[in-house]
């Protein structure tokens, strides 16, 4: 007999607990048309999937560990109370903040019939007027009024079914520049002080990263150019015509090696070629 009693007790516990692999993802119509309606009509549900608690005595981050089921969404039955005795405004203040509605009640339909109302709320830390918005949200479901003669007190103190969840914030993607755009680069050219043609200054140039055109060619250092060219071509000063005439004799084509002009030119060439 004792074995049969234990077997029956184990069977009842299995019926009251969610089965392995069970996931609770009800729709708005199912929450209103089945779960909340059975709660209001005092009809029992064999599995306690939705607990009855006063959610306003908890902060939202404490509610997941109180819930019976749920991974990212948690459900609770809660009697909505009034903020003041003679007011229809509900009291949604918690220990650390308050719930604030984001709009009016939206009707929920099933087969063209309104089965209830849905309100969205956001949780704020702090007091009203100085609160900080959080990612915690709530969907509050309630049944529609049975008659048009319900008093404000009856409309305020009603059973609600609350869905608590944390909003997932999207992460911003990093800004990626197109292939034809380059980052901003600051170039610094320090001019040499050994040449009298150069001035003592530092020039800065910024390449615009948003420009589609290639950067303009950079001006070359005149001092650098004159020394590079000097190895390949001699630098002539004075009257070019007189210098050319001194290279030729009357017979044409032969250099005059013993002329004064040739001596001057030879000293210039020897000075450039010596290491």
UniProtKB/Swiss-Prot annotation:
Expressed in roots, root caps, cotyledons, tips and margin of young leaves, senescent regions of fully expanded leaves and floral tissues, including old sepals, petals, staments, mature anthers and pollen grains. Not detected in the abscission zone of open flowers, emerging lateral roots and root meristematic zones. Keywords: DNA-binding, Nucleus, Transcription, Transcription regulation. Residues 198-211 have a biased composition (Basic and acidic residues). PROSITE patterns: NAC (PS51005). Induction: Up-regulated by H(2)O(2), paraquat, ozone, 3-aminotriazole and salt stress. It is found in: Nucleus. Residues 18-167 form the NAC domain. Transmembrane segments: none annotated. It comes from the Eukaryota. GO terms for cellular component: nucleus. Its main location: nucleus. GO terms for molecular function: DNA binding; DNA-binding transcription factor activity. Disruption phenotype: Precocious senescence and lowered abiotic stress tolerance. It holds the Pfam family NAM. Residues 1-24, 191-219 are annotated as: Disordered. Gene3D superfamilies: NAC domain. The NAC domain includes a DNA-binding domain and a dimerization domain. Transcription factor that binds to the 5'- RRYGCCGT-3' consensus core sequence. Central longevity regulator. Negative regulator of leaf senescence. Modulates cellular H(2)O(2) levels and enhances tolerance to various abiotic stresses through the regulation of DREB2A. This is Transcription factor JUNGBRUNNEN 1.
């Amino acid at each position: 007999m004792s074995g049969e009693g234990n077997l029956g007790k184990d069977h009842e516990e299995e019926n009251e607990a969610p089965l392995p692999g069970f996931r609770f993802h009800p729709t708005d119509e199912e929450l209103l048309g089945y779960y909340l309606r059975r709660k209001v009509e005092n009809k029992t549900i064999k599995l306690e999937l939705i607990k009855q608690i006063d959610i306003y005595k908890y902060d939202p981050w404490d509610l997941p560990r109180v819930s019976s089921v749920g991974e990212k969404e948690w459900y609770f039955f809660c009697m909505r109370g009034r903020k003041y005795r003679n007011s229809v405004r509900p009291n949604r203040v918690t220990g650390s903040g308050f719930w604030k509605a984001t709009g009016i009640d939206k009707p929920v339909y099933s087969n063209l019939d309104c089965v209830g109302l849905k309100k969205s709320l956001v949780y704020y830390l702090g007091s009203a007027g100085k609160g900080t918005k959080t990612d915690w949200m709530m969907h509050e479901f309630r049944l529609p009024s049975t008659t048009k003669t319900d008093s404000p007190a009856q409309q305020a103190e009603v059973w609600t079914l609350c869905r608590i969840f944390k909003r997932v914030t999207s992460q911003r993607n990093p800004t990626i520049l197109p292939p034809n755009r380059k980052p901003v680069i600051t170039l610094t050219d320090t001019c040499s002080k050994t040449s009298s043609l150069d001035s003592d200054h530092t020039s800065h140039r910024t390449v615009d990263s948003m420009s589609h055109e290639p950067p303009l060619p950079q001006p070359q250092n005149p001092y650098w150019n004159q020394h590079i060219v000097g190895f390949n071509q001699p630098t002539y000063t004075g009257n070019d015509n007189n210098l050319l005439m001194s290279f030729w004799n009357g017979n044409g084509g032969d250099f005059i090696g013993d002329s004064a002009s040739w001596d001057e030119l030879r000293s210039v060439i020897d000075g450039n070629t010596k290491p």
